[in-house]
């Protein structure tokens, strides 16, 4: 695992993999224009054609690193790159009256070096035309770009695209595909957050991580009033190729993507990640180590949620560990999983720049049988909010061999809340802090003599109120140490129950402690399962130090 390379990819600041060699795959024919910016000649296209392209491409060697950009683009600063704006009057569907959707393209430059080709597709005739780069499509403003270096560069291509929805057809985008195979979407807050990827390769292995590229896109022309659009894309990398179909529903409160992919392995792959997503967790209620700012919490996502194939619901709060951690949660035919941002209270963040309280959750819903495998979760130490440090994906159990063909179908929900929740009680929040004293008697002059760590897990919903008179039983499992001072408290402000317990070490090990808890009433589970990973301090640090200065 090359951490530097991963961080570059997670920021989508560099396209790190292959060219497509598509020039030999397109013929020339007449075409009836469906977009007035498409200027290429036509070729028949549909999803089966794309699958054949990806299959054939996998039989050839990878095309290698991207070619150099013109110097005026290669040396751009982020500020200069952001100054380049697409001309909204030349958007993909600007000639369609009463359109509800539109598409604009990102310019090449800075870290975005991989040429991406764009095509307009008339689905009625199955004819596609390429949209070639030309400087007239962009406004360069104060970017300092020497446009003379771009003249005659029709094969320069684009870096990616973004989609807009009425009434914000040219001002606030709702979907963005930019860099490698990264893409994002928003809910009704118009606030971007975590990202998804087309594919992850060797994220946590003894070889450098590989970042496949989306190298070409085909856009089906929308009709007036449509709020759904379809785009096809070709994926390429040293180890694999892929044909993808995205049907993107731009609803009022969320964006839903139906994804179909067909994958063709060039090489053996140690670790294949399906439907990967990338997020950031610097600090939160449960992890305060990096929160010495005015902001109580800083994160794009607060938990990994899983709906296992056997019906069990899992809540796993995220961490910012002191060293890289990778966990694999085994499953068979999962019903869904995702990185969620469920805490939407502004007062918990106090951030008017990042607006973390508005960031969307991302939920994956498999649409075919995925078989045996695991949900992989990687957490990387970070000292701030500018680098993504959380990765999540589905890893098939069966190793991928050269020549293998795979297909996965799934839905992605970009929304404030996932489309489904457990009917049982849900985890509301997780907190940790000093332990070893009675709740309500925080140490004053005398600190506890025995060191312990307290955990408070809040549950809401389900049948908690009905279960309370019968008796609620926390079922706690630990990989090491002991749980003591277990308490169950009703908390009126959020109308739920808080489970308290103190973790006491029983040896000097500093290995991560895997914790598991659910609530039971008369033998039946009444809550989803809470999972957590705690990192105990070294034995010589397991003491309380009173560093107060009495004045």
Swiss-Prot record:
Pathway participation: Glycan metabolism; osmoregulated periplasmic glucan (OPG) biosynthesis
Any coiled-coil regions, as ranges: none
Main localization category: periplasm
Alphabetic keyword roster: Periplasm, Signal
Subcellular location: Periplasm
Record's comment on post-translational modification: Predicted to be exported by the Tat system. The position of the signal peptide cleavage has not been experimentally proven.
GO biological processes: beta-glucan biosynthetic process
GO cellular component, one term: outer membrane-bounded periplasmic space
S-S bonds: none
Pfam families: MdoG (PF04349)
PROSITE patterns membership: TAT
PANTHER family: GLUCANS BIOSYNTHESIS PROTEIN (PTHR30504), GLUCANS BIOSYNTHESIS PROTEIN D (PTHR30504:SF3)
Family in the record: Belongs to the OpgD/OpgG family.
Protein's name in the database: Glucans biosynthesis protein D
Source species: Enterobacter sp. (strain 638)
Gene: mdoD
């Amino acid at each position: 695992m090359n951490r530097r390379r991963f961080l570059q990819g997670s920021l989508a600041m560099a396209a790190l993999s292959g060219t497509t060699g598509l020039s030999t795959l397109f013929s020339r024919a007449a075409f009836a224009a469906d977009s007035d910016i498409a200027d290429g000649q036509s070729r028949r296209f549909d999803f089966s054609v794309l699958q054949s392209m990806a299959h054939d491409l996998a039989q050839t060697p990878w095309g290698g690193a991207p070619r150099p950009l013109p110097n005026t683009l290669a040396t751009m600063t982020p500020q200069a790159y952001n100054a380049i704006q697409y001309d909204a009057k030349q958007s993909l569907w600007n000639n369609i009256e009463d359109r509800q959707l539109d598409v604009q393209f990102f310019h090449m430059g800075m870290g975005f070096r991989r040429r991406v080709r764009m095509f307009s597709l008339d689905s009625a005739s199955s004819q596609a035309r390429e949209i070639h780069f030309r400087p007239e499509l962009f406004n360069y403003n104060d970017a300092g770009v020497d446009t003379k270096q771009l003249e005659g560069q029709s094969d320069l291509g684009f870096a990616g695209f973004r989609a807009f929805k009425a009434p914000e057809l040219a001002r606030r985008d709702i979907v963005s595909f930019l860099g490698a195979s990264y893409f994002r979407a928003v809910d009704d807050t118009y606030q971007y957050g975590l990202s998804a990827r087309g594919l992850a390769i060797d994220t946590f292995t003894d070889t450098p991580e590989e970042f496949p590229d989306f190298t070409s896109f085909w856009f089906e022309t929308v009709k007036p009033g449509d709020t759904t659009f379809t785009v096809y894309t070709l994926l390429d990398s040293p180890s694999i190729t892929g044909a993808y179909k995205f049907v993107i529903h731009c609803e009022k409160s969320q964006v839903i993507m139906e994804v179909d992919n067909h994958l063709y392995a060039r090489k053996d792959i140690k670790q294949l990640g399906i439907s990967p997503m990338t997020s950031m967790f610097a600090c939160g209620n449960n992890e305060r180590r990096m929160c010495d700012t005015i902001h109580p919490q800083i994160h794009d996502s607060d938990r990994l949620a899983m709906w296992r194939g056997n019906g069990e619901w899992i809540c796993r709060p995220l961490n910012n560990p002191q060293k890289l951690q990778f966990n694999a949660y085994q499953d068979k035919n999962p019903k869904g999983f995702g990185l969620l941002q469920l805490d939407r209270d502004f007062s918990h963040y106090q951030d008017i720049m990042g607006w973390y309280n508005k960031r969307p959750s991302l939920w994956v819903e498999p649409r075919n049988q995925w078989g045996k495998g695991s949900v992989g979760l990687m957490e990387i130490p970070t000292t701030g909010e500018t680098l993504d440090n959380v990765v999540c994906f589905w890893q098939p159990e069966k190793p991928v061999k050269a020549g293998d063909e795979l297909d996965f179908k799934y839905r992605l929900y970009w929304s404030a809340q996932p489309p489904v929740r457990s009917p049982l009680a849900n985890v509301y929040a997780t907190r940790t802090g000093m332990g070893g004293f009675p709740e309500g008697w925080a140490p004053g002059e005398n600190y506890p003599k025995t060191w312990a760590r307290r955990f408070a897990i809040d549950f809401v919903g389900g049948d908690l109120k009905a279960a309370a008179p019968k008796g609620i039983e926390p079922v706690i499992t630990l990989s090491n140490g002991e749980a003591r001072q277990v308490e169950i408290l009703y908390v009126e402000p959020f109308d739920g129950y808080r489970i308290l317990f103190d973790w006491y070490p029983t040896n000097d090990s500093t290995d991560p402690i895997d914790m598991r808890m659910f609530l039971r009433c008369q033998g039946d589970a009444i809550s989803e399962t809470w999972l957590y990973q705690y990192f105990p301090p070294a034995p010589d640090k397991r003491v309380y130090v009173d560093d107060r200065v009495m004045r």
